[in-house]
A protein has these predicted regions:
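Conserved beta-strand positions in the central sheet of alpha/beta enzyme cores
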Residues: 67, 108, 137, 160, ...
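Active-site acidic/histidine proton-transfer and metal-coordination neighborhood
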Residues: 92, 98, 102-196, 202-206, ...
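Histidine-acidic metal/acid-base catalytic patches
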Residues: 3-4, 22-43, 47-65, 181-196, ...
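A short acidic, helix-capping loop that chelates divalent metal ions and anchors anionic groups
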Residues: 74-81, 167-171, 203, 230-235, ...
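Glycine-rich, proline-tolerant flexible connector loops at the mouths of alpha/beta enzymes
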Residues: 68-94
């Protein structure tokens, strides 16, 4: 597969004005960080389990934050209840109690659709505010960006545009391209940016560090992944064993003064991935410890 040729056309405009840092009133407290990074899981890692179990497994793996997704079963005790932005206040209280039990902070929600249907999009942001989230993660309808920006400002909740892999049979799918994502947010409120999915960059033939440089200062969160090969067929492996170059990714995020969360979305070994996830978090912990020992 030919590797994608990086284009810096849109990013160049940002370089002229220096690094743009994403700022928000909702900072992630240091107690939820491993070194300088808030790292935990995207609950989709544990999609064969309930959201309650995903919280517990995140804690078992050493994570301190979690990103939820819509549609996951809430708990194994109530198979009819789902986690989404229409869940009842009663179930939301149960979710918060489970988070408190394992001292896990919820930080994001997605990937969730956002459109010009204001009632539905507003429900997403209202849910995010109720749960105390920093951001929602979406692949929004581009024509809805004005409405989304209005809601971001009103709720002080960020919106991070996610990228799935390039779709050769669907040229209209553009979120895989960091230049396109940047074009949607570059002239808007800084609380609009990217959820940089490192694994999907690799599957699209995009070198992750190059993508992050294009998105300079607009990375709100990241789905951090190391893949076994640089192709659409790549699958997750523990950090340091693949081709994503996780150390370079972490260094680039540090250079950009990234203050968001790293969501481990481990889409392999689905039924027993906690040891692999723990190894990934341990890699970041070791990287941070080694960095602090540098002269």
């Amino acid at each position: 597969m030919k590797k994608w040729s990086v284009r810096f056309s849109v990013a160049a405009a940002l370089v002229v004005f220096g690094c743009i840092s994403v700022r928000s009133e909702s900072k992630i407290p240091d107690e939820y960080k491993t070194g300088d990074f808030a790292i935990g899981c995207q609950a989709y890692t544990f999609n064969r389990y309930s959201a309650f179990e995903a919280i517990e497994k995140t804690a078992q793996a050493g994570g301190k934050v979690i990103e939820f997704y819509p549609g996951q079963k809430l708990s194994k005790d109530d198979p009819t209840a789902k986690l989404d932005h229409h869940m009842s206040d009663e179930n939301l209280a149960k979710l918060k109690a489970q988070l408190d039990k394992f001292h896990i902070k919820p930080v994001n929600y997605g990937v969730v659709g956002l459109s010009n249907n204001e009632q539905e999009s507003r429900a997403v942001f209202e849910f995010a505010r109720k749960l105390g989230l920093r951001a929602v993660t979406s692949e929004p309808q581009p024509e809805a960006m004005d409405l989304i920006e209005k809601l971001v400002k009103e709720y002080d909740v960020m919106m991070a545009i996610h990228n799935h892999p390039k779709q050769p049979r669907n040229p209209n799918y553009k979120f895989w391209d960091p230049n396109y994502v940047l074009s949607l947010v570059a002239n808007r409120d800084r609380r609009l940016g990217s959820c940089a999915d490192i694994g999907h960059f690799v599957r699209s033939g995009v070198k992750p560090v190059d993508a992050l440089r294009i998105l300079n200062g607009r990375v709100i969160s990241s789905h951090l992944k190391d893949l076994n090969e640089f192709s659409p067929r790549g699958h997750d492996v523990p950090f340091g064993l693949g081709v994503s170059d996780i150390p370079a990714v972490l260094e680039e995020l540090r250079r950009q003064h990234f203050d968001g969360n790293l969501s481990l979305e481990y889409e392999y070994n689905w039924d027993a991935s906690v040891p692999d996830v723990a190894q990934c978090i341990g890699f970041v912990r070791g990287y941070e410890a080694h960095r602090k020992m540098r002269p």
